[in-house]
Design a protein with these regions (language model features):
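Eukaryote-biased, non-catalytic alpha-solenoid scaffold regions
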Residues: 1-193
């Protein structure tokens, strides 16, 4: 992979933006354009750029007023655009696993839930049923624990949608249905799987 200096990277520092959402929305659009241009000739490099942007989004946007919904919409559109770029990159399973580890860390660090939609794409991001099954096995014990009748609290885990998406992509449909039946609260986001 050739060395590449992403123009957007310096613009997405932690707390880089004030409270107004106009500038971050514009910067997200510019970053997407930059990544898509690179994707035409170097899909693996573009996928790496997509991961870098996803890692940087939430920390950079934490201080922005997102009450209008424009910022959330821009981030969701970015995820919708970036996921296929990451999926299409033809890489070794070990590199894809490292990418997923980085994305999982970004999801865990997502304090303002800007990139939570990424979990819905987890099965696609895994690309292979084997990798999806591996991630399902990672997430499954935690989901079962938070959905247990004995669990205290409200039963939230940032990896729930990623677990369900991984089970689906791995072809473990019966296991997915059994798990969904264990949910303490019946939410459409979980039951659609």
């Amino acid at each position: 992979m050739s060395a590449h200096k992403w123009q957007f990277a310096s613009r997405f520092r932690r707390h880089a933006f004030g409270w107004r959402s106009d500038t971050p929305v514009q910067r997200i659009k510019e970053a997407i354009t930059e990544i898509k241009q690179v994707a035409r000739k170097e899909p693996v490099l573009a996928a790496e750029g997509a991961i870098i942007l996803l890692e940087k989004l939430s920390p950079a946007l934490e201080q922005v007023d997102s009450s209008s919904g424009a910022l959330g919409s821009a981030v969701n559109k970015a995820i919708d655009t970036l996921v296929p770029i990451i999926v299409k990159a033809d890489v070794e399973p070990k590199l894809r696993q490292r990418w997923l580890e980085r994305l999982w860390q970004a999801l865990q660090d997502d304090e303002m839930p800007y990139i939570e939609l990424l979990g819905d794409y987890w099965g696609e991001l895994c690309v292979t049923p084997e990798l999806a099954s591996h991630w399902a096995d990672e997430f499954l014990p935690v989901v079962e624990s938070v959905w247990s009748p004995k669990a205290s609290g409200h039963g939230f885990f940032k990896g729930t949608s990623a677990c369900l998406a991984s089970l689906y992509a791995a072809g473990r449909h019966q296991e997915l249905l059994v798990l969904i039946d264990k949910a303490r609260f019946k939410w459409w986001n979980d039951r659609r799987w």
